[in-house]
Amino acid sequence: MRNYINLIEAVQKGCPVATHDIDKNLKNRQAAIDNYHYGPANPDRAEGYWKDSALIFDVSEATAKTMLCGNCAAFDVSDSMRKCMADGIQGDETGVDANASINLADLGYCNFLHFKCAGSRSCKAWVTGGPITEKDKNKSAD
């Protein structure tokens, strides 16, 4: 019951459901893997991922390696989104350092595919111009 209440509170605060619902987040992430070439699974051991990405985008492998979630215009690392993610990770656990996890994984929220994603990964939905910061959100509100 508490999880349901947390989800309602998250939505009321303007947070995407996937920032607070791990099952929804993992479902959306799996869809990104299956349908949008989200990866590599382990950025430290990419094993052919970048070669495949280069073929998808018709660019060199070196160029494909620059097309990361961390510089995608759908990658939201604004203060407000980081708070949404931190609140969702922490939940009711007072001993959890959610920001440490966010920082170590370089997490942001993908506004296109609706899940928490790592800045060191990439996918077919990548577009230039990111990431989204609080400053960008303030500009769009004007």
Residue ranges and their predicted role:
Residues Y4-D142:
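Cysteine-centered metal-binding/redox modules
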